[in-house]
Amino acid sequence: MIKHSLSDCLADPDHLIRIKSYVEANVRFLGLSLVTLLVTIQMFRALGSPLRLNKPLVGRRSILEPRWLVGLRFTKGGRELLRQAYKKYKDEIFKVQCNDTEICVLPHRYVEELRGLPASKVSSPQALYNKGLGSYTGLEVIVESHLHFQAIQGHLTPNLASALGIVLDELQDALKTVLPDCSDEWVPFDVHTVLSELVSRLSSRVFGGLELARNQQWIQLSTAYPRNAFACTMALRMVPRIIRPLLAAVLPTYWRTRSNIRDAKRIVGGIITKRRADEGATDMSAKEHPCDLLQWMMNAAAGTETHADDLAHRLLFISDASVMTTSLLISHCLYDLVAHPEALSCIREEVHNVLREGDNFQKTTLHKMRSLDSALKESQRLNPPFLMTFDRVVREPLLLSDGTQIPVGTHLAMPTDAMLQDSSLLPQGGVAPDQFDPFRYARAREDPENAQRFQLATTEAKSLVFGHGKHACPGRFFASSEAKIILSHLLLLYDFRYPEGKGRPESWLFSENVAIDPNARLLIKKRNDAASNLAMLAKAL
């Protein structure tokens, strides 16, 4: 049959032409049908569902362009896209597509209106959970209750003076073991890795006591967990939701993240068990009773919060936030100051003069270090950890004061990085917004009306790195004080410079995140006057 048909075709050229025309027509029809289907799908997506806010989506080159491609472009160039969008829509609402999430970006005039809304209307923890893919990275505890938030706000901040004393005590030992030996020569200094371990040591002492701070496995996992969780989140957000369980099953960082959480529960769980066994002891002096964040959470916990696994999980989350943000803050500032040696010398002199007056390292002493505070805030301005902050997820239909209706499920945020480049929102005077001016905020505070403004830990509608309102970062006062203590010690005890031919490293940008270049290095050498400065620092304990 086949041979016969083939011979017929060869004998009749017109028959071949008819077959060829038939195939071409069907291919064209199938191609046209496929294109029509894709166009229809994209048009429906572009028009959006009734629950999608009808505002301009920046970064989209065509209404036919798929959202995943827009999100991919944001992953690589989010900072520039947000800054350009801010210039165009500064006083308007616009949207950006971040991988899997459409974010509604609001002008800062809405901050005061939104900050007071109840959690039943807008949720900050839910926004963090969604962005961090909490079901994969273990963020369930932050939406189940606010025990950790309340413990920091109600106990750590009011007891900041005693917490700083603990930080200083732990720092004396940590400097000997964490920093490289550089007494006689310049040696390479892995800034972010070393500072992450240093911050983990100091914070862990305040969060869970001496036993936790000296547990090397805890220190390792408290610095590894943020890296693994971040890498896991970024990988999973690149693929559709339906594929995520399959990808997670073969993703090494997912399994490392879960392993970090299990190890944290084992380590902290052991401490909790021992403390509960000691609670009934009558021979313990008041001095022996634990006084740290873990104990404050244990005392206030109720229901499922009392479970050791729950408490340990919360402590790991707090450590994650502390280590990541504080080490980034100090690293960026150190890089900036080493690139501006005159400013570094001025700040070193300020720290020296304040401590030479005989003041102890307390909150009032740190307040006197205005140039150091200003340099940290300026460095943070140029390299905030996130391009957008003040994140909220709308839980109930929201009607803003100007009549704007926000649908349920909308993810709201503020363009923090772009706002920090807006000269109209910065203190008057100083160099251009894109330049590092270490004394920008110190000069502004010379005006008596601004004496309590423009500090690293203060928040306002124009400065949202730590958020603003009742959901602002509760640990910012501890973090800013810890950063100043660490940096002041480093400046008094060590000299720093860039390797030959190197300069201030560019930050790594990935989606909404601003990170340190992990390959960047400084050179470090102990100062000639380190011994006398160390003695002065010891008197300030």
UniProtKB/Swiss-Prot annotation:
GO terms for biological process: secondary metabolic process. Its cofactor is heme. One of its GO terms (molecular function) is oxidoreductase activity, acting on paired donors, with incorporation or reduction of molecular oxygen. Disulfide bonds: none annotated. Pathway: Mycotoxin biosynthesis. Its EC number is 1.-.-.-. Heme binds at C473. It comes from the Eukaryota. Keywords: Heme, Iron, Metal-binding, Monooxygenase, Oxidoreductase. Signal peptide: none annotated. Belongs to the cytochrome P450 family. PANTHER family: CYTOCHROME P450, CYTOCHROME P450 MONOOXYGENASE AN1598-RELATED. Geranylgeranyl pyrophosphate synthase; part of the gene cluster that mediates the biosynthesis of aphidicolin, a specific inhibitor of eukaryotic DNA synthesis and DNA polymerase alpha. The geranylgeranyl pyrophosphate synthase GGS is required for supplying a sufficient amount of geranylgeranyl diphosphate (GGDP), the general precursor of diterpenes. The diterpene synthase ACS then catalyzes the conversion of geranylgeranyl diphosphate to aphidicolan-16-beta-ol via the intermediate syn-copalyldiphosphate (syn-CDP). This is Cytochrome P450 monooxygenase 2. The lineage of its organism: Eukaryota, Fungi, Dikarya, Ascomycota, Pezizomycotina. The gene is PbP450-2.
